[in-house]
């Protein structure tokens, strides 16, 4: 999940653009005009989206704004004399998708305003959330905790060791197992002990995890997938089933509510123009 923090880095891939014989390029976060650090207001494309901002002595200053095709704001990146301060990412309907305060905090939202994930960059704590706003999965240092929608702990691990939360393992006649807490079934385990399925308080499937493949899948209460992946790749989904965010090793992509890619860390920068 920490990989999701990469979305807020301004990645410049050294594309070139010629305008009236003048050559512009981005290199290591600096904009150059005929090999000299440039000052002025520039327009360019990141992927297919138009971006505009002011640069002073090659460094971004003020607000760098990226827009959707219809002209609505997709992202604002705030700088002061080249220092990155914060980011705001928006859905097409104007609702915040994400806020990022450099070195402090990041929050990610669905288009209805629901908080999906949060990251405290000072403590290293990361959290994902149920639809009712309660924490779902929390990582704090070496401790990981899974909660049901009523904020009740289903399991807790620290330093790779399972913490006793008062659960009981019960074997059934067919060789499968149930995990009980306070005389209530909170999880089920297959006969081989390879796949465990944690449950919502009302019995719906919340999360499945395989000790063989390493695959994990988390579900909304209606049964649709919220997340699926392993240690090297993962996908998060909107409530409508469309993909929201995807990472594979060092690559990542963000998508709008219709499943269209809007941001990635491998977008090319093209069509650089100085407008002021």
State where each predicted segment sits:
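Positively charged n-region of N-terminal signal peptides that target proteins for export
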Residues: 1-4
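Glycine/tyrosine- and acidic-biased, solvent-exposed loop/turn segments at the edges of beta-strands
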Residues: 14-276
């Amino acid at each position: 999940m920490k990989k999701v923090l990469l979305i807020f880095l301004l990645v410049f891939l050294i594309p070139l653009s010629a305008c009236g014989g003048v050559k512009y390029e981005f290199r290591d976060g600096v904009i150059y005009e005929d090999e000299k650090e440039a000052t002025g207001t520039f327009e360019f494309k990141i992927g297919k989206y138009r971006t505009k901002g002011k640069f002073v002595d090659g460094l971004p200053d003020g607000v760098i704004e990226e827009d959707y095709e219809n002209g609505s704001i997709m992202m604002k990146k705030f700088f002061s004399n080249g220092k990155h301060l914060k980011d705001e990412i928006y859905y097409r309907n104007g609702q915040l998708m994400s806020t990022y305060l450099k070195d402090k905090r990041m929050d990610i939202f669905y288009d209805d305003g629901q908080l999906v994930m949060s990251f405290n960059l000072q403590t290293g704590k990361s959290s994902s959330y149920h639809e009712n706003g309660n924490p779902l999965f929390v990582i704090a240092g070496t401790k990981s905790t899974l909660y049901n929608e009523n904020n009740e702990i289903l399991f807790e691990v620290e330093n790779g060791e399972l913490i006793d939360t008062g659960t009981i393992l019960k074997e059934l006649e067919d060789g499968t197992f149930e995990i009980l807490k306070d005389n209530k079934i909170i999880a089920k385990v297959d006969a081989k002990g390879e796949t465990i399925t944690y449950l919502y308080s009302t019995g719906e499937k919340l999360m499945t995890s395989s000790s063989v493949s390493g695959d994990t899948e988390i579900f909304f209460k209606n049964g649709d997938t919220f997340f699926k992946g392993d240690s090297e790749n993962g996908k998060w989904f909107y409530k409508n089933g469309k993909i929201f965010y995807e990472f594979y090793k060092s690559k990542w992509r963000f998508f709008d509510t219709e499943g269209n890619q809007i941001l990635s860390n491998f977008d090319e920068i093209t069509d650089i123009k100085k407008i002021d």
